[in-house]
Amino acid sequence: MRKKVIFGNWKMNGTNKSLEDFLYQVDNKVNNSKITAGLAVPYVMLQTGIKLAKNVKIAAQNVHFELKGAYTGEISVSMLKEIGVEYVIIGHSERREMFFETDLDINKKAKILLENNMIPIICCGESLETKEQGKTIEFVNNQINLIYQNISKQDAIKTIIAYEPIWAIGTGKTANSLDAEEVCKKIRENLAKIYDNLTAEKITIQYGGSVKPSNIQEYLKMPNIDGALVGGASLLANDYLGLVNYNE
């Protein structure tokens, strides 16, 4: 049985003070033992979060694929590991679109994280144009094929996949639960082709895209949706608690 994994993503929002206030309100109220609850925050807030959070896993929103070097403005795996970061989001559509990250970049990031015993949350998802062309499954599976190149099945089961249709991120539009389940099911079937059925069944697949307390239950009751990666609805303490303490 795969444990549900629900992570908020603050993106470029908040301050150290607002994170302190947020964790004071939520950390001791995260009380669902069947769920891993987390929050991805900007780099400058990571140490604050790790110091204060006991029940909420604090994640980074990105990492560079090199261990060190002349990469101004970047952060390495070793820097994150030193301060206690376990989870890192990679391949978010905003980074793909704004910073031209490719699936091969994301593959390198996944491998360096896994080599350092950290857990990548690997984002994938299609544009509205791709969806309207009826090519969602083909597109997303191609992303997965490239990202999981040369990753062993022993490492693959440590990863988390976040299926986030680009057209549903921050727009208020959502893939309905049946459509989201269909894509997540096809992702798992593709993972079974890359590895085997047993490995595919062990990999956590989240859904993201305008998830909020009022609809999270609808998604998480689906057999192939193992959690959620949530943006805007994770910024307020009450909303976050409504997500991670949802009624099954």
Swiss-Prot record:
Protein location: Cytoplasm
Keywords for the protein's UniProt record, in alphabetical order: Cytoplasm, Gluconeogenesis, Glycolysis, Isomerase
Domain of life: Bacteria
Active-site residues per Swiss-Prot or TrEMBL entry: 92, 164
Top EC category: isomerase
Gene Ontology CC terms, in alphabetical order: cytosol
Function: Involved in the gluconeogenesis. Catalyzes stereospecifically the conversion of dihydroxyacetone phosphate (DHAP) to D-glyceraldehyde-3-phosphate (G3P).
Protein name: Triosephosphate isomerase
Organism name: Mycoplasma capricolum subsp. capricolum (strain California kid / ATCC 27343 / NCTC 10154)
Underlying gene: tpiA
